[in-house]
Amino acid sequence: MTKKKRENLGVALEIDGLEKKLSQCRRDLEVVNSRLCGVELSSEARRSLEKEKSSLMNKASNYEKELKLLRQENRKNMLLSVAIFLLLTVIYAYWAL
């Protein structure tokens, strides 16, 4: 996803979207695997399904890598939010005394 698009979406929404894409990709992969294991196929049909399977596996791998990065970014954002909250709490407590 481009940096411009990322700025418009929240990290949590991006994670949700990628999880949906990954889930769909895994379902498609299961369908391809069941077709490969099922009926006798011609060598051309088998090659086509193997190619599709490879493509889906690469896509799933890329989605997983991007999800990992987004989760790390989300974790950093959460820690930053907690740090700001604690800082404001300390400032308020000092001011209130």
UniProtKB/Swiss-Prot annotation:
Keywords (alphabetical) are: Coiled coil, Membrane, Transmembrane, Transmembrane helix
Q: What is this protein called?
A: Coiled-coil domain-containing protein 167
Alphabetized PANTHER family for the sequence: COILED-COIL DOMAIN-CONTAINING PROTEIN 167 (PTHR31759:SF1)
Q: Where in the cell is it found?
A: Membrane
**InterPro entries from the entry?**
CCDC-167
Bilayer topology reads:
Single-pass membrane protein
Q: Where along the sequence do coiled-coil regions lie?
A: 10-79
TM region(s), chain numbering: 77-97
The record ties this protein, via Pfam families, to: CCDC-167
Q: Does the keyword Membrane apply?
A: yes
Q: Which domain of life is it from?
A: Eukaryota
Q: Which GO terms describe its cellular component?
A: membrane
